[in-house]
Regions:
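Pocket-lining segment of extracytoplasmic ligand-binding domains
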Residues: 172, 178-270
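Short helix-initiation/N-cap motifs at beta->coil->alpha
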Residues: 71-83, 96, 164, 169-184
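Conserved C-terminal helix/tail region of periplasmic/extracytoplasmic solute-binding proteins
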Residues: 306-354
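Flexible hinge/capping segments at coil-to-helix
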Residues: 127-142, 233-237
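A ligand-binding cleft/hinge motif common to bilobed small-molecule-binding domains
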Residues: 94-106, 156, 161, 188-207, ...
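Secondary-structure end/capping motifs
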Residues: 37-38, 234-318
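Short, polar/charged alpha-helical segment
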Residues: 36-68, 106, 158, 300-303
């Protein structure tokens, strides 16, 4: 009887302990490889930025009191996101192609879940009175870019197409805010970037002399939502709901009737609406906000891996086998009735037949 009572007591204690564990809140840590103006915890230009500003993840788990969403925006961009993954401080993150490939090459256990911010154009702005009117004029000049980001690789590809390499220019490693300050004060001669440069030009503080928009599509930048493999394997149902939320944000961000509201939402980042209008001019929202892991996207990542190593930005070969994990995306698209909502593209950049 004593043994039975002891066993019952242990079972009860274990049950209470297990119940307490079950009630422990789960915090889903979501990172973003950028930060808003004046360090605002928002960004723009991607469906992931919409998910944050529109609280899509928070709404997805609104009826789950033990699940919390915690966003972190990184001034250090993609390289800082890799540190977060390496230290198990992030479960999901929006991240550009080059840093995510570097993370893969260095052994980070992640999975690519959906595209977000794919096909983003790159801009080149020159300081006023710099005498720079074309890419070839950059030789020997001080040029700002943020090392280790997808803009870094895109900039090198643009330079190479015009007969230059990274050693032909004086690279100054600056984040977005630093670039704006240095270009305005003319401490640098030119800079690669996007909306912050469009904004400077609109104020008359710099001149846009080039953009990849309308040029070779291989010069553009890609990005996506990356997940930590250990979290995905431990919480597949929650991972599915996270992807569902991102897909819903992508759908809303792709609807042309939402264009004005979308830019107003992204304005939470501090980027003026007219700048966003220019950034997305001549592009459909669906083209820029598609979450699809199609042949074009995969081929672009493969090319970025090869080019990244060739340019010395990635030290090892990048094994992409098994990295792309489309099953959660495909499930979301099927259940949300979005099978033909976005156009998929082949590796040659041409649309797939419907």
């Amino acid at each position: 009887m004593k043994l039975a009572s002891l066993a019952a007591g242990i079972a009860l204690a274990l049950g209470l302990f297990t119940g307490a564990l079950a009630e422990e809140p789960l915090v889903i840590h979501v990172g973003y490889a950028a930060i808003g103006v004046d360090n605002r915890p928002y960004s723009e230009g991607t469906s992931a930025a919409t998910a944050r500003a529109g609280e899509y993840l928070e709404k997805e788990f609104a009826n789950d009191p033990n699940i919390k969403i915690e966003w972190t925006f990184f001034k250090g961009a993609g390289p800082a996101v890799n540190e977060g993954f390496a230290n198990d401080q992030l479960d999901f993150a929006y991240q550009g192609d080059l840093p995510s490939l570097i993370g893969r090459a260095t052994g980070l256990k992640t999975r690519y879940l959906l595209a977000s911010g794919a096909r983003k154009p790159l801009y080149l702005a020159a300081a006023k009175a710099s005498g720079i009117t074309r890419i070839e004029d950059l030789k020997g000049r001080k040029i700002a870019l943020q090392r280790g980001t997808n803009g870094h690789l895109a900039a090198i590809k643009v330079l190479a197409a015009h007969g230059l390499n990274e050693r032909d220019v004086q690279v100054v490693n600056l984040d977005s805010a630093g670039t704006v300050a240095a270009l305005t004060s003319k401490d640098i001669d030119a800079a690669f970037g996007d909306t912050q440069l469009i904004n400077l030009a609109a104020k008359g503080a710099a001149d846009i002399i080039y953009t990849t928009k309308g040029d070779d599509p291989r010069f553009g930048r890609n990005a996506g939502v990356i997940g930590r493999q250990a979290f995905i394997e431990a919480h597949p149902e929650i991972t599915q709901r996270v992807v569902d939320a991102f897909v819903k944000a992508a759908k809303w961000s792709s609807d042309e009737q939402n264009r004005p509201a979308l830019f107003e939402l992204w304005h939470k980042s501090g980027t003026p609406v007219p700048i966003l209008e220019e950034y997305f001019s001549n592009d459909t929202l669906a083209y820029r906000n598609s979450p699809l892991i199609d042949d074009l996207l995969v081929s672009q990542y493969k090319e970025q891996a090869v080019k990244g190593k060739a340019f010395g930005l990635i030290r090892r070969d990048v094994d992409l086998n098994g990295w792309f994990e489309p099953k959660y995306l495909n499930s979301a698209i099927e259940r949300l009735g979005l099978k033909n909502f976005w156009q998929s593209y082949g590796a040659d950049g041409k649309p797939h037949a419907s």
